[in-house]
Regions:
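Conserved SAM-binding loop
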Residues: 6-9, 15-125
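Conserved SAM-binding loop and adjacent beta-strand
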Residues: 1-3
Length: 125
């Protein structure tokens, strides 16, 4: 189940997407289905989740023209240049970070001007 309905937003359909805390890749795979020309990158700290995302990608790879990749990394130090992504998703992650403001600043650094940042947190947070 996706946290966001990407079809209802005005997205650059041939742009690039970063999922910070991608887990097993559900948002990556959702974007690949809706926007097959969008390059997707999933970043997570958990090796097991990244392995499952790679396994899932084998199933979804044929529906995307731009592809996806998964990598280990931290929301505090994103390994990308400034102004790289048209869309950044961070779903159910910020509440786990002690310095979530620092992560949001880092996310803003790699988001292109006019890009979209979608975050979700539990209602109790």
């Amino acid at each position: 189940m996706l946290t966001f309905n990407f079809k209802k937003y005005d997205l650059n359909k041939e742009g690039s997407m970063l999922d910070v805390g991608c887990g097993e890749g559900r948002h990556i795979f959702g974007v690949m289905q809706e926007f097959p020309m969008m390059k997707c990158i999933g970043l997570d700290m958990d090796n097991d989740s990244l392995q499952k995302a790679e396994e899932g990608y084998a199933y979804f790879e044929s529906i995307s023209d731009a592809g996806a990749e998964f990598m280990k990394g931290s929301a505090y130090s994103l390994p990308f240049s400034d102004n790289t992504f048209d869309l950044i998703v961070c779903s159910e992650v910020l509440e786990h970070l002690h310095e979530y403001n620092d992560a949001v600043i880092e996310i803003n650094r790699v988001l292109k001007p006019g890009g979209k940042f979608y975050a979700s947190v539990p209602a109790s947070w």
